[in-house]
Amino acid sequence: MVLKVYGPHFASPKRALVTLIEKGVAFETIPVDLMKGEHKQPAYLALQPFGTVPAVVDGDYKIFESRAVMRYVAEKYRSQGPDLLGKTVEDRGQVEQWLDVEATTYHPPLLNLTLHIMFASVMGFPSDEKLIKESEEKLAGVLDVYEAHLSKSKYLAGDFVSLADLAHLPFTDYLVGPIGKAYMIKDRKHVSAWWDDISSRPAWKETVAKYSFPA
C-alpha cells in the first residue's frame, strides 16, 4: 500500500513531501480543504487529532507532525537516497539540534509573519503591524546567528544536506516570495549561499512545481 500524505498544498506538509522525494519513496497525496473545515471533520481527526496538516498513513501506521514525518521517512528509508541523518551519532546530534532550532527559534517569528502578512485577510483577522515588526526583528537576530554558523559550515549540521536544512524550505520560501522580505536572506552572504543551494535541489523544485496552490 502506497504511503499517503494529507494536505500537500500547505507549507508544513511540504517538509514531508521534500523528504519523500529526496529519498525516492512512492507516495500519493490527498487534499484537505482547510477553508471548508475538512481538517475538523471526524474522518480527518481520526488521523490527526489536533486538526492540522499533514497527516501521513503508511499501511496500518499513522503519523502526524511534519518534522516527525521527516524523521520517520529518513530512518525507514535510510538505505536509499541521500543520508539525511548523518553517518555518526555526532552528526545525528547536530541534525537534531538544528531541527529543534528550526522548530523553536526560527519558525515562530516566521510563522507570525506568514499569518499576518499573507493570510490575515483570508482568515478574517486584522493584521498586527506591531507583531510584524517584532517578529521581523526577532527573525533577524536568529538569522544573524545562522550567518555566523554558516560561515564555518556549508550546511546546518555539517558538510552534508540533512533534515535540518530541508525543514527550513517551505516557510523560507514564503519569506523570500509572497511575504516580500527576501532581503533578510540575501543581505547575509552565507545564509544566502546556503538558501540558494538548498532551494535549488531537484527534490524541492519538484515539490514546489507539483504541490503549490494554483496561481
UniProtKB/Swiss-Prot annotation:
Q: How is its activity regulated?
A: Redox-regulated enzyme; in oxidative stress conditions methionine oxidation ensure a thermodynamic and structural compensatory mechanism to guarantee H(2)O(2) peroxidase activity despite transferase activity inhibition.
Q: Which UniProt keywords apply?
A: Cytoplasm, Detoxification, Oxidation, Oxidoreductase, Peroxidase, Phosphoprotein, Stress response, Transferase
Q: What is its EC number?
A: 2.5.1.18
Q: Any idea which residues bear Phosphoserine here? A: 12
Amino-acid positions noted as binding glutathione in the UniProt annotation, renumbered to this chain: 11-12, 39-40, 52-53, 65-66
Q: What InterPro entries is this protein classified in?
A: Glutathione-S-Trfase_C-like, Glutathione-S-Trfase_C_sf, Glutathione_S-Trfase, Glutathione_S-Trfase_N, GST_C, GST_Phi_C, Thioredoxin-like_sf
SUPFAM superfamilies hit by this protein: GST C-terminal domain-like (SSF47616), Thioredoxin-like (SSF52833)
**Molecular functions (GO terms):** copper ion binding; glutathione binding; glutathione peroxidase activity; glutathione transferase activity; salicylic acid binding
Record's GO cellular component terms: apoplast; chloroplast; chloroplast stroma; cytoplasm; cytosol; peroxisome; plant-type vacuole; plasma membrane
- Enzymatic reactions: RX + glutathione = an S-substituted glutathione + a halide anion + H(+)
The modified positions for Methionine sulfoxide read: 35, 118, 123, 184
Per UniProt, subcellular location reads as: Cytoplasm, Cytosol
User: Mind telling me how this protein is modified after translation?
Assistant: Oxidated at Met-35, Met-118, Met-123 and Met-184 in oxidative stress conditions (e.g. hydrogen peroxide H(2)O(2)).
Q: Domain (GST C-terminal): give its ranges.
A: 88-215
User: Induction: what does the entry report?
Assistant: By zinc in roots and benoxacor.
Span of domain GST N-terminal: 2-81
Q: Per the record's keyword annotation, is Protease included, yes or no? A: no
What family is it from?
Belongs to the GST superfamily. Phi family.
Please state what the protein is called: Glutathione S-transferase F9
